[in-house]
Amino acid sequence: MKFELKKTEGRARRGRLVFDRGVVETPAFMPVGTYGTVKGMTPEEVKDTGAQILLGNTFHLWLRPGQDIMRKHGDLHDFMNWHGPILTDSGGFQVFSLGHIRKIKEEGVHFRNPINGEKIFLSPEKSMEIQNDLGSDVVMIFDECTPYPATHDVAKKSMEMSLRWATRSRQRFDELENKNALFGIIQGGVYEDLRDVSLKGLLDIGFDGYAVGGLAVGEPKEDMHRILKHVCPQIPEDKPRYLMGVGKPEDLVEGVRRGIDMFDCVMPTRNARNGHLFTTDGVVKIRNAKYKDDVTSLDAECDCYTCKNYTKSYLHHLDRCNEMLGARLNTIHNLRYYQRLMQGLRDAIDAGTLDDFVADFYQRQDKPVPSLD
């Protein structure tokens, strides 16, 4: 992987990630394909929304179908027939989400398989081995996602273990002679001093890119913005910056304004299945009765298949009838909305008009522009 920083405007960055499997223009949003599929979508449909790179889930793909099946296909790209770049998370967040059925120790995490109840063990080394079999273009280190809220002491101990796991992840990645990219993950909760220690430790180890983890886990938006403002300027300019698990459209805009290059989130796909649709002028909850006889398109400015061919009334009808086509059409639109938003941000940085783009984005949604301070 090669990262090229093409232009900046304020703290915002316009760049390009170059992989053997394709080029990703940044800032970029990665649709989430948890089980080797973006729910309800073919790879061709996902590509048609403008997606350049997908996120796969190491934890879930390890449990099902497993490494043996993946190796028989070649790798995850062959398995799911997506031949663009793929970033895989390490499984750390999913283990964190298991709550009471997992035990975190220095060597790794012991837990019960949520599918069949079997005892199972995941370590930094094992995560690197699984991601190697997946053929991930970007591999994420195995870390512990610091919970929120957490005291300074709890966040410190969690961050320190994540740093030790980062060293082990790097070592096993190198032993496997993996030639793809390996990203470190900055932890430390909402505490700036802990974020500093985490980043310094990761820089000492050395990675191809740096992710900001442990945000969007319940903390106030002000804390997220404060941490990004503090951390991003300290990440080397020539390395990509990835904000994990974020988020809402305004979170992407605010992340870009603070120097983030990459994002992922289940929000556009999950919300689509619940009839929660993002448009240029705000959210449309298509389930609401007022759309029953609305014969206008979902978003007059959107060029997606859904908006070009169907009315709000039809989408409302599909939702009320629980037709699977409704979820598919909604997903196509939401993914295209996110990619159009990212394209708009890239074009604005290219043109030096980011402030105007941001002002228009918030005005259309009838919201004030958040301060960068």
From Swiss-Prot:
N-terminal signal peptide: none
Mind telling me which residue stretches traverse the membrane in this protein?
none
Q: Look up the record and name the cofactor or cofactors this protein needs.
A: Zn(2+)
GO CC annotations, alphabetized: cytosol
Matching SUPFAM superfamilies: tRNA-guanine transglycosylase
Offer one example of a GO biological process linked to this entry: tRNA-guanine transglycosylation
Return the cofactor note field: Binds 1 zinc ion per subunit.
Keyword set, alphabetical order:
Glycosyltransferase, Metal-binding, Queuosine biosynthesis, Transferase, tRNA processing, Zinc
* Chain intervals for the UniProt region annotation (RNA binding): 245-251, 269-273
Coiled-coil boundaries: none
Is the Calcium keyword given for this protein?
A: no
One Pfam family recorded for the sequence: TGT
Residues annotated for substrate binding in this entry: D89, S90, G91, G92, F93, D143, Q187, G214
EC numbers = 2.4.2.29
Detail which positions bind Zn(2+): C302, C304, C307, H333
Which reactions fall under this protein's catalytic activity? 7-aminomethyl-7-carbaguanine + guanosine(34) in tRNA = 7-aminomethyl-7-carbaguanosine(34) in tRNA + guanine
Task: Give this protein's Gene Ontology molecular function annotations.
Answer: metal ion binding; tRNA-guanosine(34) queuine transglycosylase activity
Where along the chain is the active site annotated?
Answer: D89 (proton acceptor), D264 (nucleophile)
Specify the pathway.
tRNA modification; tRNA-queuosine biosynthesis
What is said about its interaction partners and assembly? Homodimer. Within each dimer, one monomer is responsible for RNA recognition and catalysis, while the other monomer binds to the replacement base PreQ1.
Q: What does this protein do?
A: Catalyzes the base-exchange of a guanine (G) residue with the queuine precursor 7-aminomethyl-7-deazaguanine (PreQ1) at position 34 (anticodon wobble position) in tRNAs with GU(N) anticodons (tRNA-Asp, -Asn, -His and -Tyr). Catalysis occurs through a double-displacement mechanism. The nucleophile active site attacks the C1' of nucleotide 34 to detach the guanine base from the RNA, forming a covalent enzyme-RNA intermediate. The proton acceptor active site deprotonates the incoming PreQ1, allowing a nucleophilic attack on the C1' of the ribose to form the product.
Family from the record: Belongs to the queuine tRNA-ribosyltransferase family.
**Name of protein:** Queuine tRNA-ribosyltransferase
Instruction: Specify the species.
Output: Tolumonas auensis (strain DSM 9187 / NBRC 110442 / TA 4)
